[in-house]
Structures are given as structure tokens and as C-alpha cells.
């Protein structure tokens, strides 16, 4: 017991006003490819309830090497792989369940193949693991410690059998009270096995007066105002929202301040499709991808873009081409720092709109065109409208306009 306590103490997250080692490495890599693949791919679903038969998983031409090769050629620094989604289906050979790839018609360890391919192409390897498990019986046990043991055992498999893991991305925490997850214990276990690994939990930050109400990234513009919902964490997540241009990094836990960068998650698809569908879906334009790249990798934050394989087990050529074209356009080079955008001259500039919808300045005022928030907007009352922006007397060579659309930014 003394040794265990010693290990836990050594791996505590310390209050700080600047990034720690794991956060420094997270910020440095900056740009990753998200890969959603599993039972949902073959069921045409985004989420499933853990009841889909395991033999539904049946890729016809599985090629994990192709996934990572695309990531490498597109300039990604790391691959973030779904190892287990909310349905509980595992993409590796787990000793603790038969709801995994080894019980399917295609008995190949996806986690191993992706990890090996990352080593081959010189990329870092990260894993997504859903806390919520809709298949595992112990999840519904009266003694939830049974599930914590199950989860801990699976995480140990992932952290010890597949080489270096740069990041663990947890999801689904909303399904249970925060304390049930025993996150300090899980965090310390991860750090003991993989000390440089960054750990994050989706919906990381909450309001001080309501610890189960997560704060949207657009509101995270004041240091030390909001508190951890999931402590400890090395970085913030709010999938798939986008941080404010004035995003702040310091958040509170028990009166102490901690530095937390933000990791963005986007889909290559305009339809916000995480698991690939039978029908080919349009991808975001290069213009949109370029501006989102610059926005999301700015200010010591990071970006992962989801490019999911289809039922054959391959990334579709048109999606691979789109992300590689982005790398060419903005000049992403392997072993070189990520490209940076120029100064945003219009940020918080004075504006004069020709009209405001319903004269509701609080919701749709012209100031929201330049406030740096992706969730706020100027909305005119007229079909044809103008917005005058008072810019500083500095040269510029690009104008970027984000249009508010119903399902995604454009």
C-alpha cells in the first residue's frame, strides 16, 4: 500500500500557470488524424447500444497501413484511434471481453496494426476509449467498482502492449456521476505506465455553481473563472465545438489554478459524420479546411480531423485527396513546425452594421462579426446588408469570412 500511494502522489497534476511536459508535447504535435472504425461502420450508425452481433464487423479489404500512410502524407503528427466506442466493441484482442475483433470474421488486432504503422511512418499514436460501455455487464453492476476494474484492466492492455501512447482521450463521462469514474486513480495509473501521455476527458470544464453543466468553449475567455468537471485532465475537450480566438488556459480545482490547452475535433465531412456511411458524403472545401486549421491550431491549441475508413477497411480516395491537398496548400511539412496564420486584424474591431435582425443587438449585433467567437454571429434584418469594420492601419493580404450554417461552419 505504501508503494501504491507513493506512485499516485508522484503522478498528481500540479497547479501551474504554464504547460507541463505532457502538455508541451501535445502542443508541439498539434495536428492529428482521428479514426472512427468499428461496428457502427457496418451498421450505418453513429452510436449503437452494444447489442449489434459481433459478426456484423466484417471489413472486406482491411488496410490499416493505408490509413496511417494517408495521415503521414497529409502532414498529421499523430493518429487518434477509436479503440472502444460507447457500444463497447473493442478493436484489439482483449482478455477481458469476447465483444472484440478477435470474435469477428476478421480476426485482426486493429490497435496493433495502427500502432505498428505509426512507428513505420514516424507518427505518434493516441487512443480514444469510451468510459461509457453499453455492452459490458459489469457496467450495470450494483458494485460499479467491478466496471472500474474491467476498465483499468483494458487500459493496462492498451498502455503496455502497443508501444508509446501520446494521448488518452476519454468520452462518455456524462452517463455516471463524476466521482464514480475514479479519475485520479485512472490518471495516476496511466501516468505510471506512460509518463508523457496526455489525458483528457470530453466536456472537461464546468460552471462553479453547477459541476455537471459543461462550459462551451466560446465562453472560455476569462482565466480562473470556470472549474474542472473531470479532474485531473491535461487538456480540455468539448467535441465538436471550437474555441474562442481569445481562448484562456487557466481553470480551477479546489481553489488552485491549472493550465489546460484545448483539443479541437472536426470531421472532413460536411455532414459531421464520425463513422463512415455507405453513401459518399461531400467534404469541406479547401478554403474552409484551411481557415479551420489556422483557427484551431492557434493559441497553443490542437486539432484532430476525423477521416473514417469505410466498410472495406480503407479511407476513401476522395477524402484522402482532400486532406492531402490541404497539406499542399498551406505548406505542412514533416519535421517542420505547423504553419501559422497572420495577425487577425479585425478581432474586436469597432463595426457599423446596416441592420440587425429584429433589432436584437444582444443576440445578433454587429460586434459578433469580429468578437472572435465561432458560436456568435451578426445577423442582418435585410437580404442585402453591409458591415463596416474599422481596421487598424496595417497591411493585410487575406480576408476570411465564416458563414453561420445550421449544422457546421462554412
Question: What is each of the regions a protein language model found here?
Answer:
Residues 1-11:
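Bacterial Sec-dependent N-terminal signal peptides
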Amino acid at each position: 500500500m505504501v508503494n501504491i500511494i507513493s506512485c499516485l502522489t508522484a503522478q498528481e497534476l500540479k497547479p501551474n500557470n504554464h504547460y507541463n511536459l505532457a502538455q508541451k508535447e501535445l502542443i508541439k504535435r498539434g495536428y492529428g488524424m482521428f479514426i472512427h472504425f468499428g461496428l457502427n461502420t457496418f451498421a450505418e450508425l453513429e452510436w449503437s447500444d452494444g447489442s449489434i452481433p459481433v459478426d456484423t464487423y466484417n471489413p472486406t479489404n482491411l488496410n490499416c497501413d493505408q490509413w496511417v500512410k494517408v495521415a503521414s502524407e497529409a502532414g498529421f503528427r499523430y493518429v487518434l484511434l477509436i479503440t472502444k466506442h460507447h457500444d463497447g466493441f473493442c478493436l484489439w484482442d482483449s482478455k477481458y471481453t469476447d465483444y472484440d475483433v478477435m470474435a469477428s470474421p476478421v480476426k485482426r488486432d486493429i490497435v496493433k496494426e495502427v500502432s505498428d504503422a505509426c512507428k513505420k511512418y514516424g507518427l505518434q499514436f493516441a487512443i480514444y476509449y469510451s468510459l461509457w460501455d453499453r455492452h459490458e455487464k459489469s457496467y450495470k453492476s450494483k458494485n460499479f467498482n467491478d466496471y472500474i476494474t474491467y476498465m483499468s484492466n483494458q487500459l493496462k492492455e492498451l498502455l503496455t502492449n502497443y508501444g508509446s501512447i501520446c494521448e488518452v482521450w476519454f468520452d462518455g463521462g456524462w452517463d455516471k456521476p463524476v466521482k464514480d469514474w475514479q479519475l485520479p486513480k485512472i490518471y495516476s495509473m496511466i501516468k505510471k505506465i506512460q509518463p508523457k501521455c496526455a489525458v483528457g476527458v470530453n466536456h472537461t470544464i464546468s460552471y462553479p455553481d453547477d459541476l455537471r453543466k459543461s462550459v462551451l468553449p466560446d465562453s472560455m475567455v476569462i482565466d480562473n473563472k470556470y472549474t474542472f468537471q473531470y479532474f485531473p485532465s491535461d487538456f480540455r475537450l468539448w467535441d465538436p465545438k471550437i474555441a474562442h480566438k481569445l481562448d484562456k488556459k487557466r481553470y480551477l480545482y479546489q481553489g488552485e489554478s491549472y493550465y489546460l490547452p484545448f483539443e479541437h475535433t472536426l470531421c472532413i465531412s460536411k455532414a459531421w459524420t464520425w463513422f463512415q456511411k455507405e453513401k459518399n458524403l461531400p467534404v469541406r472545401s479547401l478554403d474552409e479546411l484551411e481557415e479551420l486549421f489556422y483557427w484551431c491550431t492557434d493559441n497553443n491549441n490542437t486539432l484532430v480531423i476525423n477521416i473514417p475508413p469505410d466498410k472495406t477497411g480503407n479511407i476513401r480516395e476522395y477524402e484522402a485527396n482532400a486532406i492531402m491537398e490541404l497539406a499542399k496548400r498551406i505548406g505542412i511539412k514533416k519535421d517542420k513546425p505547423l504553419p501559422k496564420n497572420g495577425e487577425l486584424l479585425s478581432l474586436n474591431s469597432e463595426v457599423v452594421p446596416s441592420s440587425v435582425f429584429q433589432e436584437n443587438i444582444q443576440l445578433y449585433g454587429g460586434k459578433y462579426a469580429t468578437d472572435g467567437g465561432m458560436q456568435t454571429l451578426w445577423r442582418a434584418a435585410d437580404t442585402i446588408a453591409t458591415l463596416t469594420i474599422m481596421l487598424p492601419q496595417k497591411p493585410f493580404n487575406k480576408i476570411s469570412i465564416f458563414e453561420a450554417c445550421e449544422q457546421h461552419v462554412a
